[in-house]
C-alpha cells in the first residue's frame, strides 16, 4: 500500500492544507469586497479595452448573482499566496507519489526478471 508510505502522508497533509486554504481565500475576498474581474467591488473602476463605460454594459458583463468569485491574479493578498503555495505542494506531492510508484514498479520488474 503506497498510501501508507511517507510520500502518501505528505500528499494527505497537502490536501488538508489545500482544503483549509480554500475557504480562507474566499472569505478574505468577500471581506475585502473583491467581486469583479478587475479586483474591486464598484462599477466603472476599471474598464477593459473595447468595453463601454456605461452602467448598461457593466450589468450585461458582470452580475453579482451569477459571477464566479475566483482568485484575482493581479492583487497579491496573503490568502492567494497561501492558496498557490498549497497548490504547488499538492502538485509536488502528486509528482513524488507518481515517481515513487514508477520507481518501485521498475525496481520490482528488474529484480523479478531473469538474467
Swiss-Prot record:
Compartments reported by the entry: Virion membrane; Host membrane; Host Golgi apparatus, Host trans-Golgi network
Membrane topology listed for this record: Single-pass type I membrane protein
Transmembrane feature ranges: 78-98
Family of the protein in this entry: Belongs to the herpesviridae glycoprotein N family.
Quaternary structure, from the entry: Interacts (via N-terminus) with gM (via N-terminus). The gM-gN heterodimer forms the gCII complex.
Intravirion side: 99-115
Lineage: Viruses, Duplodnaviria, Heunggongvirae, Peploviricota, Herviviricetes
A Pfam family that the UniProt record links to this protein: Herpes_UL49_5
Keyword NADP: no
Domain of life according to the entry: Viruses
Record's signal peptide: 1-27
Free-text function comment from the UniProt entry: Envelope glycoprotein necessary for proper maturation of gM and modulation of its membrane fusion activity. Also plays a critical role in virion morphogenesis.
Protein's recorded name: Envelope glycoprotein N
HAMAP family: HSV_GN
GO cellular component: host cell Golgi apparatus; host cell membrane; membrane; viral envelope; virion membrane
Gene name for this UniProt entry: gN
Keywords tagged on the record: Disulfide bond, Host Golgi apparatus, Host membrane, Membrane, Signal, Transmembrane, Transmembrane helix, Viral envelope protein, Virion
Claim: Membrane is one of the keywords in the record: yes
Virion surface topological segments: 28-77
